[in-house]
Amino acid sequence: MTSKVLDLQQKGVEVIGFAAGEPDFPTWDHVCEAAHQAIRDGEFRYTAVGGTPRLKQAICTKLQRDNGLTYSPAEVLASCGGKHSLYNAMQAVLDEGDEVVIPGPFWVSYPDMAALSGGVPRIVMAQESNGFLLTPQELRAALTPRTKLVILNSPSNPTGATYSEEQIAALGRVLAHHTCWIITDDVYEFIRYDGARPKHLATLVPELRDRVIVSNSVSKTYAMTGWRIGYTAAPLPVIRAITTLQSQSTSNPSAIAQTAAAAALAGPQDQLEPMVVQFRKRRDYICERLNAISGLSVAVPGGAFYVFVNCRGVFEKTGVADGDALALQLLDAARVGVVGGNDFGSADHFRISYATSMEQIEKGMDAIERHLGSL
């Protein structure tokens, strides 16, 4: 959908874009300056496959400071974005036929990554009535002797579902009785609206420490999506396997981007909270507007910058059968770009990203309301 919106915009068509999953804020000044200095210093060469010593130490510092996790530089690796980090991890730990438990609604890439790694995605749909939060009972029922990996993402894309510390610990206690790997996709960890900074799963349930693979990136927290730096922290055998894989695929990430990422992770963090405050204002406004439109409903998300809109109530009057078809109709008739929910695991929904200005959000809500009200 993002490409469709961009194509129309390039043709001069005014489209309100709610599809892109990236912050609309600029990368922080001191991070950009670090990149400029790297250029002036001639950092143009290959680096070690897993990243520069400076970046790896910054990752370790961040994990200790923010998550209470102690890793050595040998146990972390820098990749070409958070998606690359997740793909590497699945390639490293999955064998043909291994089951991968994926809570749904889910980020669209998880099942495909699992399948490309030989795994069998096992989708466990969380209930909308429970805020799209997976319960310990639902997780326990999904685990089988063939379960090799569980993926946990909080806050979540596409729903914004955000687990409390108690809920994370409860899921961890279930996983403590199984011998599977756990990937925590922490890319939205600081974009949450309850003011909490819960401890990490591997801290709350220490016996899981040797089975947890931490996946993260600088993309969302520091508005650095285009810089393409992700990272993984994991037991040494996993990092060694990923290093071998990465050495024969992408090799090292951009040297200049690595220096910028190190500055982001190790430098001042004071610009994060103002960004979250703006996201919270947008969330509150967009949820109020959507819930006032007949046939639409949305559970207020606890984090990230998405709302997952239940649109089943407008299928009859719009003449569509699912969220994907409604998304195409909204693009064609209202010139609003949203993402249909089918690929996220729910045909009754569509996703809106509110990582855009309030002016655009207001225009987009007006256009959706006007279109649905005219039918």
Residue ranges and their predicted role:
Residues Y46-S79:
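Conserved N-terminal alpha-helix of the aminotransferase class I/II PLP-enzyme fold
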Residues M1, L8-I16, E22-A38, D66-L375:
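PLP-dependent class I/II
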Residues I16-E22, Q37-L55:
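A glycine-/small-polar-enriched, mobile loop at the entrance of the PLP active site in fold-type I
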